[in-house]
Amino acid sequence: MEKLTILLLVAAVLMWTQALIQEKRPKEKIKFLSKRKTTAESWWEGECSGWSVYCTQHSECCSGECTGNYCELF
């Protein structure tokens, strides 16, 4: 009976630690993803140009598309 009790306690501790590890992983992913700015945030802060604005490179446009020296919508 004592061996069964010890075995159950060990199993409970292992399951508890596994649950803690899995709980931390999504939080780390959320922190990583939240550091990225949305297109609207980048535009609002002036880091990229909006639609129909003069451009010379794709990276200047929020959409990432510079066609005919003007930023595309999408």
From Swiss-Prot:
Residues 20-46 form a propeptide. InterPro entries: Conotoxin. The keyword GTP-binding does not apply. It is found in: Secreted. Keywords: Disulfide bond, Knottin, Neurotoxin, Secreted, Signal, Toxin. Its main location: secreted. GO terms for cellular component: extracellular region. The keyword Secreted applies. Expressed by the venom duct. Residues 1-19 form the signal peptide. GO terms for molecular function: ion channel inhibitor activity; toxin activity. Disulfide bonds join 48-62, 55-66, 61-71. It comes from the Eukaryota. The presence of a 'disulfide through disulfide knot' structurally defines this protein as a knottin. Belongs to the conotoxin O2 superfamily. This is Conotoxin VnMEKL-0221. It comes from Conus ventricosus.
